[in-house]
């Protein structure tokens, strides 16, 4: 399956000032497969090592940080084949299980800069925090992976012609039915299936929703098992409680995350470490409030007032026990969660683009689902789950802060209008992957 992260790997390989690459991302989002495939296609030799269960591997790093010795022992002893600097890609998988291997990346950067070495881990954020691991600041390149984006999903499911065709259309042009009908269907399927590669592969192989759900159930169980595997029993219980509360909290009108809704009477102090664990693991995504939208938004964010989404919209749908037919056919009673799924979908697409969003809210409850300062510009994004695009909050925001460009994303077709100083675009949910194209057009980047 085609992943855009592959291009990032190629760019890393060809950099003149290349450093060891540290690939992070939620468990089962496709890191190991992609890195191995990259090695198979781009290198004469691949030396793969996995710290999760490969006996004796950690001891190679326990003695000292002599990189020549480490490479010699990894090659000659562990795998029984010499590692050649100019030809071999060295992969250190599940590196979070070996703190000294993470530290060794600094010395590989300094002593053997020509060696192609990729380290990957699913719980890197958790390990770095809980084990007090000294991170090799400035000595590694970073790549964060996510589940498959909508664009990647469509291409994997045989819809490349629709993606390619849409990319050729003028941005101002209303999208013809030739594209809208199949892409709306792909969008609904993406809400059901999500972007976890194993689930997507099951869907591609069978086009059976129940088969895909069986894979989703296994992943959800694996996540829950990780809570107890990598934390104390007390913390695992708290993480599980937060994990179970996320779909409930997302579905509320005011989807601000409230700790007392996790456990009656609970305070933030009691549960914030458990929340940090689930966010650092990549399983959940945290969206902070910005009340005063000034650039940089990161400096204006209130990390104590936030929403929590999941890193995969298909897993959210499955965990919330929403029948796939409800997504595909619709239901008059399916209202609040339908909007929550659309928001979670846009959040994931923005993250896949490398964009960090926030949300905006006033004391009078006017709210913008997402705002970002991508490219140094303030950009509000309002999300609607159907084709009703009335957006009072967006008009209020544009009138008050005068962003040069703003977006309404729904099932309504492409359209635009000028409101004061703001150019407001209607961008269909299934065409949101063109978000950056509209930015480039607006600002002539």
Predicted feature descriptions by range:
Residues 53-86:
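Short glycine-rich substrate-engagement loop in P-loop NTPases that contacts/grips substrate
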Residues 91, 116-122, 144:
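Structural recognition of the conserved hydrophobic beta-strand(s) that form the central parallel beta-sheet
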Residues 128-251:
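Interdomain motor-coupling "hinge/lid" segment immediately C-terminal to the ATP-binding subdomain
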Residues 34, 38:
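Hydrophobic positions on the alpha1 helix immediately C-terminal to the Walker A/P-loop
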Residues 1-16:
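Pre-Walker A adenine-sensing motif
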Residues 346, 350, 368-387, 406:
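Conserved catalytic cores of phosphodiester-cleaving nucleases, focusing on short active-site segments
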Residues 31:
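Conserved lysine of the Walker
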Residues 201-372:
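Accessory nucleic acid-recognition modules appended to NTPase machines
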